[in-house]
Each structure stands twice: as C-alpha cells, then as structure tokens.
C-alpha cells in the first residue's frame, strides 16, 4: 500500500449543527395537530408558552364585556421593530373590532352627539299666563258645611282641629244627597284628583250616625266597609276617619291591610269597631276565615264604599270585589236596631277617571245609582281634566341625557327654594319612575354618591350632609337641606308606612328642607301629601288615567302646583296631542338644553370624582375665578361621567344600574295597546338608554351572565347515573367501616 492510499482526512464537525439538521429533517406524523405542533416545537428546541405575558403598555388586553373564556386564540408576541409596530397601530387605530383593548378601557360616548332629532318645534297647546285662573278643586267661598246637613259637632271639629271651613264642589253635591238618601239609591262619585272625595262620603256617613238618638259605641257593630286598592290609600283613609271621629271617642275605625299581623287584626275585631277600612285581599280573607267580622257586619252594616274603582279593576281585584259583595249580601241585616239608618245596603263607587274597568265594576256593584260629578261634559261624555291651577310643563329629552336633565331639574328647584329664603316652610317634590329597580338606582345615585349622607328611617330616607356634591348649587359652607326618599311596592309594609309618614310630616326634622321622593305608581293614587310643590314624571305613565293621578299629587284643594313630563324624541312627541284634551289650560314646552341644563350647570365648576381636590380648589367651587366662564355642557358631561365612573368602580351600584335598566325596558313594553304607537320598545335606542343609567354598554354586551365580577357562581354539572352509583357505593362502604356503626 502506498502512502497515497493510506492518506487520512480529518474533518471537524459541529455536533449542534448536525443535530439541528437532523431535527429539521425529522417529520412528525399522526395524532392531533396540536400534539404534532407541540412535538415539532420541542424538536426545534422551542418552548410552548401557555400563559400570555402581562402587557404593561396597555396596547392589548381584553375587550370589555367579553370574558376571558371567550378569547380562544392568543396572539404571539410581535417580532417587529418599534417603528413597524407604531406604523401598524396608526394604520389600524380606527378599527378596534376583533382586536384586544386594555382591560379597563370602555367606549365612552358623548352626551350631546348622535342624538335623535327633536321634530316638535312649536307648542300647539300654549299655556296663557295672562288668563285669570280659578282653582277648579278649591273650597267654595259662599258655602258652609252646616248648610249641607253635616252634624254641628263635626262642623266645629272640622274648623278647629282640621282647619277645613269650606266644602269643595264635589262635597257640596255629594253630602246632601247621601244624607237625605234613605237607602233608595247607590252613588257613583266622580271628581278630579285632590277635590276631597274621601270627605264627601265619610262626612255624611258619620253625620248620619251622630244624628241617631240611639246610644252607639264600638260594640254596636260596623256601619261602613271601605275598600281601597293600595295599603297606602287604605292607611290614609283610616287616619282621616280616625281624625274625624276623634270628636266622638266612642266611634272606632279598624284597618285591615296586608303586611300586618292577622292575629292583631282579629283582636281589634273582637273588641269591636264601627268602620272597617282595608284592602280587598285582606278583607276577603277575614270574611272567609274570621267569624267575628260577620257578627260585626250583621248588626249595623249600611254602607259599602269602593274607593279608586279604576285602580281596583286595573290591579285585577274584580273577582275579589265580586266575592266580597256576595258574602256581605248573604249576611242578614237587622234593620230594627237602628231605624234611622238606611233600610238596605248603600253602595258607593268613587273614581277620578272613567275607564272600561270602572264601567264593569259599576255594573257589578251599583244598582239604581246616582251619578255625582264635577267633570267637564263633552259630547255627552264626562271628561276628567287636570286642575286648572296646575302649571304643566313638558320637555323632550334624548335618552342619553335623561339622568343629567333630571339632576338639573332637581338642582333648579332646590336653588330656587334656597334663594327664596323660606326657611320656615318645607318643599316637597315627587319623581315618578316606572319600576322599583329604577327607584332603587335613582335613589342611590342621588343620595349615596360620595358618602356625605345620613340614614334617617332605615335605608329608605337619607339626609344629605355638608360636603355633598350631588347638585351644582350645593355649597361647602352650608348644609344641603335635602332629604331623599324611596317608595315602591317591594319594600316592607313597615318601611313604606314610616317613609310616607316622614315625608308628610311637618316638624323640625323637615322644616326648611327640600324633600325629594323617588317612587312608582304606588304613590299616585289617593294619597293626600301636604304641600307637594312639584311632580316630575321621568317615565311616562302606562295609561293617561295614571297621568292624571300623578299630577293630582300637587295642586290639591286649590293650591298651586307644577308638573314636568319627560318624553323621548320621535314617536313619543305625538303623545302630547293625545293628552291635550286633559289639559285645557295648556302647558309650557321647555328646551332641555337652554332652559334646564344651562341654568343648572353654568357659572359653576363640577369637579371629577376620581381626582384629589385641594382645599383651596374646593373652596373656589361655585365662585367666579376672575373672568373665567365655565362651559355648561362640559360641567354636565363631567357630572354624568362621575356617575359612570362610580358604576365602573362600585360593583353594588353597577348591579343597581343593570337591574334598573333591564326592569325599565321590561316596564316600557307594558304600555296599554292604545298607546303602543307612542311607546313601543322597538323605537328605543337601548345603548343610549343604558347611558342614562350610568352604563357605557348594554348589560348583555357587558357580560352580565359571565363571572367577570366574580359574584356569579357556576351551575353544578348534572351527575350521570354511573358516577352517582359509584358515589353511593363509596358512601356505603365508608359507613360500614365507620367506628360509629354498631
């Protein structure tokens, strides 16, 4: 072998390069594509990133309203240079759909843009201020109760204790006819709200009893049965009756309403009573299950009064009323014991409006009746109208601006009250909304914003304290003198009663203060709340009859009053033509921006609630700093953003807002069929309406059903039969092996 044949070549190879080329040449087959991809990445020496790194730049995140479970793909970290990333962001900044945003970012829409155009430019039913107004429900000047046949004892009691000297128009017509009636006719009393219908039937009944020569006490039996649709109205009638009979202590009324202990009511019935006042359900319950009530009625019952008949039918009490009347008619009446009373039952039906339900109830309860009315006759029909001295106002507000416009309205009323200097009087305002959840939201929004409040009666009455910034007119140097109330049917009966009593009371606790009550229609019927200056209908009523009852809480018994109705642009504007016959004195059409928002938010400085404010800056609030003028629209936007930020940061308040919005939309869909052309849920812009509840997106888009807030729990999965069998077997084996099994 030659040297050339035995020559050796020595090459140095890189093991990493060789291994890499081998790995790259390897091909993974079989299995799922995810498994193949993981194996390929492992062969290539790459690690699988299971968790996404936190993004400190805030350029990427989770779309608000979409939970983490909804994100199914994770983007890989960008390998582009910083210049390329900025260029990409700028090119795609206009399109955020389908991309991730910061976790705490939300779309904040402007209050004053993208609103529906208001088409009503001219008021077709102008209120003429130069026309002399005579209050339509005021007491008559030239008449006296004594001339109507009222007992002299009652007349002196009315003048001295109750400060009532003159009868109203409906009282002048009803009292003589009821007193002079010997059981011949029934009566249908029809009169507008605030005209004194309660006294028009209580006074003649009590006068007839007092004019008897026979001795009467609480054991003489019940002379009258009064049925009211709501607990509040029944309680009010009871208190009026108690005040009237306080001049003759031997006459005793009894109240039967739901929410109270039946045992206590039975005890009062056993002691005896002369007037039974209650709600239909509880009265029927006692008639069916309490023996003593039939004994009370059989001795002396002569009068059956159905107050607020339209509401009785609206709430579905028609069958209950029919059952009560049937049971009462089956009770034999002894007419020999009190010969001066009517020889048969006298039925009375009272209503402020004439509806189909009232006509049905009239056919069931009344026979040979007389119609007593002070309504306006038109085309042979009786039309109920609002009181002449009522100043009706209407404003058309876009849905996004409802909340801030309500705040501006309440601010203007409070500011005018403070400027008037009437510290010895009490101003009352009632705000009607459609549902109880909406009441809860608005109550907490206006009373619990910054912690400057104090609970007075449970959690339904709050006094705003010094430092509160809810209204722009508030000053740090004095107390706001504003008390916020809430009232709806979901509250307990004790809380409803105590809230109404506190709102209606005139004492040192309410003297010189502005009392604002957020309520549903539970407070719209029959309640005689003293000195209610303004009524605000934030949500339109479900029927025009409810509108008359709402505005009837003010301008009562000849007093002046104001009412403001909120409407949305579009189809709701035609509602004004629908209610025009009920307002013969016309109304004022207010522009929400120039006549409500601007007076409230100009020349003030509304501060943000997410920044710390120094004392020197805080003291300059509500003062002109040099020649600086604050834009009213900027202040209004800041005020509304404060509410929105509170919704974002406070989960409990957010739940109130979401529930209030959902319940409001559901309630909006329950308008009667005749008014669907004005109030149709299809016409609503739900996104704009959600903003009026402080929500930046509709609740469904905010992941209401997800566990984003950590409050909702996952539903347990259903256990199949096999796992259940094994679990039961393990439990049996454990029980056998237990030391306590002997």
Swiss-Prot record:
Residues 405-605 form the Helicase C-terminal domain. Gene3D superfamilies: P-loop containing nucleotide triphosphate hydrolases (3.40.50.300). One of its GO terms (cellular component) is nucleus. Its EC number is 3.6.4.13. It catalyses: ATP + H2O = ADP + phosphate + H(+). Residues 710-722 have a biased composition (Basic and acidic residues). One of its GO terms (molecular function) is ATP hydrolysis activity. It is an enzyme of class 3 (hydrolase). Pfam families: CTE_SPB4, DEAD, Helicase_C. Keywords: ATP-binding, Helicase, Hydrolase, Nucleotide-binding, Nucleus, Ribosome biogenesis, RNA-binding, rRNA processing. Residues 45-100, 701-726 are annotated as: Disordered. GO terms for biological process: endonucleolytic cleavage in ITS1 upstream of 5.8S rRNA from tricistronic rRNA transcript (SSU-rRNA, 5.8S rRNA, LSU-rRNA); maturation of LSU-rRNA from tricistronic rRNA transcript (SSU-rRNA, 5.8S rRNA, LSU-rRNA); ribosome biogenesis. A motif (DEGD box) lies at residues 307-310. ATP binds at residues 191-198. It is found in: Nucleus, Nucleolus. Residues 178-372 form the Helicase ATP-binding domain. A motif (Q motif) lies at residues 143-172. It comes from the Eukaryota. ATP-binding RNA helicase involved in the biogenesis of 60S ribosomal subunits and is required for the normal formation of 25S and 5.8S rRNAs. Belongs to the DEAD box helicase family. DDX31/DBP7 subfamily. The Q motif is unique to and characteristic of the DEAD box family of RNA helicases and controls ATP binding and hydrolysis. Present with 1460 molecules/cell in log phase SD medium. This is ATP-dependent RNA helicase DBP7. It comes from Saccharomyces cerevisiae (strain ATCC 204508 / S288c). The gene is DBP7.
């Amino acid at each position: 072998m030659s040297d050339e044949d035995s020559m050796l070549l020595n090459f140095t190879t890189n093991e990493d390069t060789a291994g890499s080329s081998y790995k790259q040449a390897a091909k993974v087959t079989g299995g799922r594509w995810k498994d193949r991809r993981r194996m390929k990445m492992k062969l290539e020496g790459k690690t699988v990133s299971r968790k996404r790194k936190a993004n400190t730049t805030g350029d990427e995140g989770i779309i608000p309203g979409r939970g983490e479970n909804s994100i199914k793909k994770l983007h890989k970290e960008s390998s582009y240079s910083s210049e390329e990333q900025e260029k990409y962001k700028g090119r795609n900044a206009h399109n955020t759909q389908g991309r991730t945003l910061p976790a705490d970012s939300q779309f904040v829409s402007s209050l004053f843009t993208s609103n529906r155009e208001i088409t009503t430019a001219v008021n077709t039913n102008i209120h003429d201020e130069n026309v002399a107004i005579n209050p339509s429900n005021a007491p008559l000047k030239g008449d006296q109760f004594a001339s109507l046949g009222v007992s002299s004892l009652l007349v002196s009691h009315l003048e001295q204790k109750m400060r009532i000297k003159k009868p109203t128009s409906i009282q002048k017509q009803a009292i003589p006819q009821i007193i002079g009636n010997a059981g011949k006719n029934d009566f249908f009393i029809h009169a507008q709200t605030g005209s004194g219908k309660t006294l028009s039937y209580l006074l003649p009944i009590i006068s007839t009893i007092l004019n008897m020569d026979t001795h009467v006490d609480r054991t003489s039996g019940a002379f009258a049965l009064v049925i009211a649709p709501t607990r509040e109205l029944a309680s009010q009638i009871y208190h009026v009756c108690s005040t009237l009979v306080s001049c003759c202590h031997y006459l005793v009324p009894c109240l039967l309403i739901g929410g109270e202990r039946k045992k206590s009511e039975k005890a009062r019935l056993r002691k005896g009573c002369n007037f039974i006042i209650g709600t239909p359900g509880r009265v029927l319950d006692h008639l069916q299950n309490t023996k003593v009530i039939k004994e009370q009625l059989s001795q002396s019952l002569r009068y059956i009064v159905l107050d607020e008949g339209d509401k009785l039918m609206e709430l579905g009490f028609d069958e209950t009323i029919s059952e009560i009347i049937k049971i009462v008619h089956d009770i034999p009446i002894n007419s020999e014991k009190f010969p001066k009373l009517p020889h048969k039952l006298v039925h009375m039906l009272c209503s402020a409006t004439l509806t189909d339900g009232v006509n049905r109830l009239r056919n069931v309860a009344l026979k040979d009746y007389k119609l007593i009315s002070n309504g306006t006759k038109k085309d042979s029909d009786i039309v109920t109208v609002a009181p002449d001295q009522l100043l009706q106002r209407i404003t058309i507000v876009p849905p996004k601006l409802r909340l801030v416009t309500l705040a501006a309205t309440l601010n203007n009323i409070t500011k005018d009250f403070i400027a008037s200097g009437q510290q010895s009087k009490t101003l009352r305002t009632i705000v009607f909304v459609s549902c109880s959840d909406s009441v809860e939201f608005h109550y907490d929004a206006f009373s619990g914003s910054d912690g400057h409040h104090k609970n007075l009666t449970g959690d339904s009455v709050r006094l705003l304290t010094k430092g509160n910034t809810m209204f722009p007119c508030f000053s740090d140097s004095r107390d706001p003198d504003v008390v916020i109330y809430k009232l709806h049917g979901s509250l307990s009966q004790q809380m409803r009663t105590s809230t109404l009593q506190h709102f209606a009371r005139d004492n040192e606790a309410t003297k010189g203060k502005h009392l604002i009550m957020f309520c549903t229609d539970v407070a719209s019927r029959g309640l005689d709340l003293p000195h209610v200056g303004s009524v605000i209908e934030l949500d339109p009523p479900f029927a025009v009859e409810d509108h008359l009852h709402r505005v009837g809480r003010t301008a009562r018994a000849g007093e002046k009053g104001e009412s403001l109705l909120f409407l949305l642009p579009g189809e709701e504007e035609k509602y004004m033509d629908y209610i025009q016959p009920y307002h013969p004195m016309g109304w004022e059409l207010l522009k929400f921006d120039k006549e409500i928002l601007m007076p409230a938010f100009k020349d003030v400085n509304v501060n943000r609630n997410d920044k710390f404010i120094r004392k020197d800056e805080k003291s300059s609030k509500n003062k002109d700093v040099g020649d600086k003028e604050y834009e009213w629209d900027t202040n209004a936007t800041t005020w509304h953003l404060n509410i929105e930020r509170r919704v974002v940061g406070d989960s409990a308040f957010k739940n109130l807002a979401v529930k209030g919005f959902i319940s409001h939309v559901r309630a909006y869909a329950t308008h009667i069929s005749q008014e669907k052309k004005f109030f149709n849920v299809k016409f609503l812009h739900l996104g704009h309406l959600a903003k009026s509840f402080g929500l930046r997106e509709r609740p469904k888009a905010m992941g209401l059903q997800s566990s984003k807030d950590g409050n909702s729990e996952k539903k347990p999965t259903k256990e199949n039969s096999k796992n259940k069998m094994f679990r039961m077997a393990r439990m049996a084996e454990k029980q056998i092996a237990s030391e306590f099994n002997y």
